[in-house]
Each structure stands twice: as structure tokens, then as C-alpha cells.
Amino acid sequence: MYDQTLLAPLSFSEGGSDGMTRPFLLSLLLVTLVLAPSASADDGAVYFKEKVFPILEERCFSCHGGKEKLKGNFRVTSREGLVVGGDYGSGIDAESPEKSLLLEMVSYKNEDYQMPPKEKLSDDDIDVLTEWMKMGAPYDPELEIKGDESERRGFSITDDQRNWWAYQPVVKPSVPKVDSELAAFIDETKPNPIDAFLLHDLSEAGLTPNGPTDAKGLLRRVYYDLIGLPPTPEEASKFATHFASEPDHALDAVVDELLARPQYGEKWARHWLDLVRYAESNGFERDNSKPQIWRYRDYVISAFNEDKPYNQFVIEQLAGDEIANPTMASVTATGFHRLMQWDDEPADRKQHVYDVLADNVLVTSETFLGMTLGCARCHDHKADPISQKDYYSFMSFFHGVTPYETPGTIRPWAEPAELAAFEDRRKDRVAAKRKEIEALEGDMIDYLKEVGKFRKDKAAPSVRTYVDDARGTPATWSFVTSAPAPGWKEVGSKAFKNWTKAQGGFGTEGTPNSFVTTEWKEPKIWMRTNFGSKEIPESLVLEIFHDEDVEVYLNGVEIFKASGHNADYQFVELGQSALDAFQTGNNVLAIHCKQTKGGQFIDAALRTGPQMPGTLPVALNRGGKRLEGELSKHFGREIVKEWREAKNKLNSIQREMPGTPLNVVKESGSQPLPLQVHLRGSAHAPGDEVEPAFPSVLGGGDSPVPASYEPVKHEVGPATSGRRLALAKWIASPENPLTSRVIMNRLWQHHFGRGIVPSTNDFGQLGEDPTHPELLDFLSATLVEKGWSLKEMHRLIISSRAYRRSSTPDSQNLLEDPQNTLFWRYDMRRLTAEEIRDSLLALSGNLNPEQGGPWVYPELPPEVLATASRPGKGWPISQDMMDRNRRSIYIHVKRSLRFQMLADFDQADTDTPCAVRFATTVPTQALAMLNSKLVNDQAVVFAEMLRADGEDDLRSRIHRGLALVTQRKPEEAEVEHCVELVERLQSERGLTEEQAMERFALVAMNLNEFMYLD
């Protein structure tokens, strides 16, 4: 009677004939399925009239068919009413008719809704309705009663809604005059308009603002607000001296200096990444990494450092590939569209496609516009003038965007000739930088060999290389990419005689830190090389770079195995099993490596291994800060610092590749598929078709986007529709009433702790009203006047007297304005999670300032690693200590496995936009600061640094330590108290002075003065 195949899940793919794509044909089939029954019209009408209608009329119409208010808002007198559904959703499930809500109700399967409520239908009646659902729920047109579904879904905008403050044009207001009683709180020679607006409202409320904070408090404020790091005692002392004589000039000079530092971009990029729910993995059970997505993070950092005009910043993220003359940066920016969670095994693939698009609509509308469009996905917005049609018209701008894992979403950006020329230049630069590093390392390595402090055997045998890697003179390997015969890894095997021979360094160009000599693109590789030796070495070292899973054999014996990928060469001391496998004469080193996706690389070296490694990075990894202290004492800090900077620069040069793989947006073509309103938000219940349009209340609605936009052709990949560019230009327009207001409110929030509109992602009627609407409009208009420069707005805000106010409570003001709504004082705040960790590393001298590049993996406690959804796959700890000590913004953001200390201190959730981090106070925070390995390790290093600085006197070391922690000159009583603590720990607890100083360092790092800004 009906075609069951129409109910099968539909797949999506490109292509087709007759000028029509398969997705278009499939959507027509789906419309046919949902809006018309799959049985013939005559058969369906007859079945409905004879079998179904009598049941509905007798048992259902009285509650769900009259003209009065429908129970549950659910009508069954028409097919439209059945599809639209009521409070519990649509009555029909087109994919699984037997699971339709109507059948669930009449079968009494759910205690919450059993219909009819007085008496259950007979089994025969339920069978009739079940068969009817399988037919597609056809109705007899003559018996349908349409009712008032159209009225129920009607939408109109009232005058009050249209006149809502956020939808009005931004007009720069006049600066108010300041009451004479508060004139002392504004600089009359150089008045800041911010102060005038705030003082005007304070005067009307009868409140007097606080006076200024001290120089130390102000400097910490500026440093943490702009770069997220503390000033040094020397910087604090210099500022205090300058501030005492020329406060305005001193503050302006510091602000200019900090805005020019690269750390500014790292700090403010973190705020932005919270908004766009940045993560480097997909989430869900597998939670695989997003290849190359870190380049979007680096783009954001660079954009802030360059002071990229905010309107351009918006356009590049939404449509950086569609602008005229796109750059690598603008194309990288479209990684914005790839930040969502991605389920690679959704139960409902069609619905999942639209769930992803819905996520994009939500993030775009909240981040750039402060509009909660997501509330209109299933029905008209309950509070704001946003219809369901508005929602899907907005989604239509993104409708051509392909799913995350569609081939082509990760692609290189460079022409072959350009790439070849750049590679030649890069190799020359790498060679020159290596020569510089070798010169710096030479004397230090000789010194370490001489003192033998970190070597068990001072004989220090010379290193012999049996198999070299691509960084030196690469060995010749025999290899295949399909499974070889057994015995391939044994000495004397002839299974490899027909294998291909090539030099080591197998992989794909662009894999970070790699030295690709031989291209390898297949999923697996088996490789072996021979070497000879006249004697058995005392120790062996394997240096290996593997991406991803690897097994290493020596003469058929497995000597190393690892899963996941390394971001660089790893130094592995081989155990007794390797020495037992080693033999005089001929030896075979064999490797099997397998790769799943993304860039790939495998390379290895085998050498003899003295107890003291012959490379300085490995020596420092083993000896840590104590060894670096020895080197600094002998050679001077500047030499060691110069060596570290040279190493960082070498890493940076190795990553500079114009042929970079980019995780970018991709569209299905220049003509996206039609999009319909989804009834109740279901992709299986399409309604009226929509065109791209801006929200009605902002001038869109029935007027689609002007037809002036055209498909955009690209040198790489198919043409795109141009729709995203039209949307981006509208959002970034000075005439858009929301864009400048929203971003200025965010800037204010991150300087004052709370936005002028406290609900920073919601400027609608469910959000909070602005406390100072005229000030917000003044700042928004000024931003546009200043060419959308965020750095200029930082200068304006920080130069205000309001920013300098102390945090001291005032009893009268607290009674009148306990929430500090009028900004009469500065709101004290705790450092953010990233600021705490970065400050600890900076304090101990361990912070690695290297900029950009792939994510890093600091150590995680075993109990945290045990929670990984895929044990052993989640967190390959970075082997280089320097990498582990980079700023927190470079730590891998894995949705299912958070870096514990950052999570403890309220790091943003990565599943939804985070506009405001709410500071919690929970026991685990105190426990982390006292007991975690991270904090205790830094306390040990901090104490050692105080000793290594040459301060032999205990009192002097404590004085220096407190000055570093608090950025001020310690009081004598404080120093004396800490001296007593150290002495008591020695006398009463039996600790050595070194151990007692480590406890002092731990206590100092827990001071409120370190953890809070006031």
C-alpha cells in the first residue's frame, strides 16, 4: 500500500544530472514524505475516512479539535496540526512512524501523557492508527479542519519591541557636565569623557566615588588586564618613581609599552576564544583532535597584536575566503566555522547537519550581535521580536557550509613555485640558526662534561651514531606501505629485497617540526635499515619523531612502542632488552608506523647513550632548573637566555610554511540547497522555504538580502555563494546598531569586571538593561570614529580616573549601591585560571615566552589521565620541558580531558559561548595551590632561583622572594615573620634550609596579594 523505502535514512552527497543535485532531489522527497502521505492520495483518503476519522472524532476532537483553546496546544483535525504538534512536539515521526508521539500517547507508554486520559483506546483502534502512521498519516481533504494553526504561528513586532534601546541607531551623545561637588574626581586639564558620564550618574544618586589606588595596585591592574602577567619588582619600582611625579604620563607610557608587547595578543585572544567556544578536539566519545585548528588561535592572537580593525576581524572570520584578494590570514580566520563539537557517529545524520548549523547561528548571533537567535529555532522567540522564520533566514547564510569532515576542509595554501622557493629560503635560515645554536652550546656542553655533576660515570664515552635521522645525514631505509611477509624485521630476512629504498624522514610536507626527505602519504609504513658494529655498547639511545602509532624493533626484538603522535623528536634511553638484542656484526633496525589522519611523519636515530646526553636540550630536560642555574652561574644568565631564544627562533622558522594546511570553511557550491523552516526544530518536518535575510526587527524579514551578492570563485576549491560575505558586511557595518555596542561592552567588562550591559551575550528583553546607556553609545560611536581600533579604546578606558579607583569599601555607598552598579569603586577580582598558572611560571623564571605554533601537553596527574575516553590516546605529554612551560593559551584544549588546574579555577566551558567566567570558591582550589605537583614544582624552582641569584643571606632571599610575589617593597615585619617561619621549620620539623625555603616559596605563592587584583 505504501513505499517503505521512502522511510529509510537519506544520505547527502554532491553531484547529479539534469542540472539538479541529489541533495535537492532528496529534500523534495522529504517534503513529499512529511507534507503528503506516501500512499496514493485515493487510498489514503479512503483509509482515513473509513478507519481513522471515526476514532479521532469520537475520542480526540473534543480536546484537540475545537475552536476554544486546545489542550496541550495540539490539534489533530488537520495534517498540518498533527505535524506542527503541541507542547510535547510533533505528533508524527516521519523517519520512524511507529515511534510517533501520537502512538506513544494512545498506547499509554509514558505516564506523563496518556491519551485519551479517561480510557485507553482498544488494541484494534491503536492498530488502525499505527497503520495510518506508517502510511504517512494521510487525511481526507474534505474532512480536514485547518483550525487556527496559521494564527498560532503568527508573528508581529510591536512598537515597544521595535523601539527597544539596542535596536536604535548608535548616536554619539553629548558629554554631560560634572557637578561641582565631584569636580575633584575628574582631570580638568585633560578631562576623560568616561569620568563625566559616570560622575553625572553618581551625582544624581548622591554617591561619592572612591579615590585612586596606589601605584603598585594600578600597575598590577594594567599588567594583568593587558598582558595577563605580573610586573617585575624592577618594573614596579620604575613605574612608582615616574608615577609620583607625572602620573598621567607614567600610565600612558606603560599602556603603550604593554599594548606593543606580543603578550597582549595572547591575553585578549583568550577572551575571544571563550566566546567562540574554542577547542582543539571534536568532543563526544572519540574526541579526536581538530587538525591544524591551532592556526585559528594564532590568527586571533596576531589580529589583536596587529590591532586589526574590529570590523575587518569580524568579516574575516565569517567570510575571509570570500573577500577580494584573500590572504592566508583571512582564510585561516574561517576556522571560526570549524570550532563546534562534531559527532562522527550521530544517530540521526540529517538532524545532526542542522544541529551543527544551529550551533553556528547561536555563536555568530551571540558573539557579534548579542542576540539570542537560538531561542527561535523551534518556535518564535518568547521574549524578543525574532520569528522562527527570522531564525531560518539567518541560518540560510550558512546553509552551503559543508560538514566538518568533508574532504577539502583541510587544504594547503600555496602555489607550488611559491612553496619551493620558500622551502629553499627556509633551509638556509635553519642551517644558519643551527650554526648559531651549536656555537652557543659548545662551551656549555664541554663544561658539563668536565664537571660531570649530572652523570653517574664521569668517563663519558663519546657518542656513536649507528643510524642517523633527517636532521643529520639520514640513513637509507627499505620500505613498503602494505603488510610485508613474516620475518621482515629479522636479520638475514630476504622479504625486503624488492622494497623501495629512500633516505629517512618519511612524511608529508607541513607536519610541524618535521624534516621530510621522502614523501609518505599512505596510512601505514614498514621500514628497515642495516648497520654494523664491532662491539656491544654499554647503553643505547633512540631518538624518534613519530606521528602516529609506532613500533620499533632491533633484530626482531621490540625495543620501543608508543601510541599517538609526538610534536618533535623524543629522546628515549633504551633498556636491557635492547642491549641484549644488539649483536656484533650486522644489525637491523625496523619500524612499523600507522597514521589515521592529518599530517604524518616518521624518523629515527640510534646512538650510543652516555649517562650525560650529548645534547644540551636533553641535559636541561634531565637536570631542570638546578642545572640551568649551574650554567647561569658559570656563563652568565644572558648566554643561557640567548641560547633558549635561539632554540625558540629555530622552532619558529621550522613552522613557517606558506604551504600550511588550513582548517577552513568549505561550501557545497555556489548555489546552496533550499532551506525550509523546520517545524518544532525537526529537520524531518520542513515548512515554508526561506531566503537569506537579516532579522525583521533590524530591517530584514520579508526583504531578503539584496541580490547584489554573487558567487565567489576561488583558486582552490569550488565557488562559494557569497552569502556569508553579505552577512559579514552587514554585521560589520557602522550602521548596525548592535556590533559596536556589543564589542565595547565586552572591553568594558574585561577592565571593570562587569559590562555596562551585565548580560554581555544578550542585549534583548531577557537580558539586563544597560546601567549607563549614554556612556555605552559614546564608546561605541568613538570606536567607529577611531577606525574600529580596540587598542585606542583600551587607552581611553585606562586613562580614566574611574579605572584608577581603589577597591576599598565605603559603608554608605555599600548601603546605596551594594552591587557597585554605578562604578563608584574598583571591583577586586581573583586572577583567572590562565593568569594564575602563567604567573607561577613567570615567578619561578620557568615561563617559556615562545609565540604560536601547535598545542602542547603539560603533565597531568595519573588520576586525571585515567578519565580519558580513550586511555593512552588522550594526552601524550610533551617531552621538552620548555614546551610544557609555555603560556596556558597554548595548552591543548581537549573537550573530554581538561588541564586540571585550569578547570579548577573556572576555565571556560568549550561547548557553548562563554561571555563571563563566574569565579567560584571551592576547596579543590586551595588544595591545588598547596598540593598540586605544578605549584610545588614551581615553589622548588623559585626557592632555588632565590639561592642561585647570589643572595646568601636568608633575610635577603626572603626579602627578594616577597618583592617578586607582591611587586612591592616588603615591610620589615613581613620579612621577620617569614624568617621565623623558615627557622622554625628547620628547628621543629628537621627540614634543611633548602627544604624550608621551598615551604616559604609555597606559602608566598598562596598569598592573596599574589592571587587577587585590588
Model-derived features: positions:
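Aromatic- and Gly/Pro-enriched helix-to-coil junctions and flexible linker segments
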Residues: 37-321, 381, 401-462, 612-757, ...
